[in-house]
Each structure stands twice: as structure tokens, then as C-alpha cells.
Amino acid sequence: ADNVMSARLALVVLPTVAFVGRLFPNLTVQGLGDPNYAYSLLKQYKGEWEFDTNWKMIFGHPKKAGWIKAIQEAQQTVQKGLKLDCPILVMSSNKSFPETETWHEEYMTSDIVLDVQDIQKYGEKLGDKVTRDTIPNGIHDLILSQKPYRNDAYQTIFEWLKKQ
């Protein structure tokens, strides 16, 4: 029920924020987010990686109305179809999980940033030479997934490249 309400709310809020972004692109519309994605990556918490948290901040970055506008416009363009004339590999995790304030182990094996069904659905509309694949237990940044799933992502990429 929460996911359905969030989706309905997004249908109203995102276009409104995008419109505001035309007039006030630098207006902050969302402050810092939850740290769970960073926790799933960083070695000092639950992950395998070390990185500069000044560049990839633990709580994300403040979202500006102009940024939301640009993303919404880009997503609408992709959803209509791009007709790119080149081989394209669309990859995602095999599952999404909603990020909340509370830590869940599913964050380690799910995309908690984007809806993987949308990635696969709209990825097909990028062009006529699209190959789609899912990586079981991959995270949003597939190459930063836990080692076994990261290896699956690399194998998928290299096998696809050999066929090109």
C-alpha cells in the first residue's frame, strides 16, 4: 500500500516540482536523504568499498528543482523511445527494494534507488539493438555489488561485448 501511495504521490509531486524547476532551478526541494545506500557500499559499515565521502556523500546531495526537472524531462524522452542506432546493453538488478530510514539486509542485494521493472521496460525503447539482462542480487551500481554478483555483472558485460 505504501508503494502504491508513493507512486501516486510521485505522479502529482514530480510534475509540480519540475514546473517549479523552470522558474527556480536552484531551489532546494529535498534535503539530505537516508544513508542506507552508502552504508551498503562503504567498508566501514556493511559494504566492501572505500571512497571519498566528500564526492559521494553518505546522505546524498540536496535535490534542486532544476535537477528534478531535467531528470523528469530525460525520463519522458526515454519513455517515448530514442531510436539509437547502436548496440545497447541494459542491465539492472533483478529486484528493487524501497529505501526507508531503517536498515534492511535487502539493501545489500537490491536496487534501492530505481525501479528495475522500469529500467527493463523503458530500456527496450532505447533502440532496435537492445539487449536486456538482470543481475540476481545486484545493487543499483551493479559493479559495486557484492563480489559474486559483481562478477555476474562483469561476465554479462564481457559476453555481450564478445557478440558485438
Segment roles from a protein language model:
Residues 97-134:
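Conserved loop-alpha-helix segment in the C-terminal half of the alpha/beta-hydrolase fold
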